[in-house]
């Protein structure tokens, strides 16, 4: 029964996204064509994988007056490396900047009514921010990673963000990646009972032990819990830790994060105990998805949660807000 529900969940959650991506025209950017730099997703964050030159390089496609003009500047020989791409056509302009490998700014400005202004920001250590439109009709979405953003705001991402990200790296294939990652996530959720966070609590306490070998062993065991413990570790405030605990936890985070590009299997292992992903699914339009998410989150509290997946949108919104408050306090 759960497996049938999982399959239905997959279809409902991502069939529209896959259709949209399959039908989208491919217009490879100058940035992608020249391949002077490659990008990767590491735990849902965009970063530069490499820059193929230690020098500053520039390129232009199109001349003034042409329908499409593109510019590209790659700075690999500066203290702070950067990638700057610009694109202008009769409908508007796009500017993409990647600074120091992981600070991403994307802006789309419109000159035609069919184009909507878009702003995307990725800054280290803070949530991503996606803004759609201007004025009173604008929408703003916040999420810790791109995968969270795709779940919490699928329509906004499909229509406005993903076409811009394809200018960076057309090979990312978001629709296919999301579908496969969700399949893996459902499998992991069936077997998960949020046990990693329980194990992590006692190990974190040992990181402030007066015995050096105890601290070393606890740090090693934290790393052995795998990438799935990262969402919990990222919730822990430095103010609740000693300096020794802070230092060792940061070493664990860095090692677990690594520089490995995201795969469906890695995404599932990482997100299976991530509360924000499952809270987002409680607000989904489709009932089977809400039911599955509520069942999985109940494992977090070790009892059913105060949530009615068949309630009205307003009732569910209020229930999710209360659940979110409970999670923050625990």
Where are these regions (language model features)?
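Bacterial N-terminal signal peptides that target proteins for export
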Residues: 1-6
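Bacterial N-terminal signal peptides
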Residues: 7-15
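An exposure/low-complexity boundary signal
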Residues: 15-16, 214
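Sec/Tat signal peptide C-region and signal peptidase I cleavage site
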Residues: 17-21
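Extended repeat-based scaffolds of very large eukaryotic assembly and lipid-transport proteins
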Residues: 23-330
């Amino acid at each position: 029964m759960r497996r049938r529900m999982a399959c239905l969940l997959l279809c409902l959650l991502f069939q529209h996204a896959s259709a949209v991506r399959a039908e989208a025209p491919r217009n490879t950017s100058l940035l992608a064509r020249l391949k002077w730099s490659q990008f990767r997703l590491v735990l849902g964050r965009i970063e530069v994988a490499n820059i193929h030159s230690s020098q500053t390089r520039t390129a232009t496609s199109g001349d003034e007056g042409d329908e499409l003009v593109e510019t590209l500047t790659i700075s690999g020989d500066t203290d702070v490396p950067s990638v700057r791409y610009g694109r202008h056509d009769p409908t508007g302009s796009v500017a993409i900047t990647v600074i120091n490998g992981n600070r991403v700014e994307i802006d789309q400005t419109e000159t035609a009514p069919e184009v909507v202004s878009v702003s995307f920001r990725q800054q280290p250590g803070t949530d991503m921010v996606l803004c759609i439109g201007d004025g009173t009709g604008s929408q703003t979405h916040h999420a810790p990673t791109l995968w969270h953003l795709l779940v919490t705001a699928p329509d906004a991402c499909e229509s406005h963000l993903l076409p811009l990200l394809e200018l960076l790296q057309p090979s990312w294939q978001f629709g296919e990646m999301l579908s496969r990652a969700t399949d893996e996530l459902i499998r992991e959720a069936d077997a998960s009972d949020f046990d990693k966070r329980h194990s992590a609590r006692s190990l974190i306490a040992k990181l402030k032990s007066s015995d050096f070998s105890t601290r070393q062993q606890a740090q090693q065991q934290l790393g052995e819990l795998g990438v799935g413990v990262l969402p919990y570790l990222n919730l822990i405030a430095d103010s609740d830790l000693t300096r020794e605990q802070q230092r060792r936890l940061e070493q664990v985070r860095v090692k677990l994060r690594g520089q490995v590009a995201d795969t469906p299997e890695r995404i599932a292992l990482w997100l299976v105990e991530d509360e924000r992903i499952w809270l987002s699914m409680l607000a989904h339009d489709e009932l089977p998805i809400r039911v599955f998410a509520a069942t999985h989150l109940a494992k977090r509290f070790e009892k059913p949660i105060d949530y009615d997946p068949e309630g009205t949108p307003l009732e569910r919104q209020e229930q999710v807000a209360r659940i979110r408050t409970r999670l923050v306090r625990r």
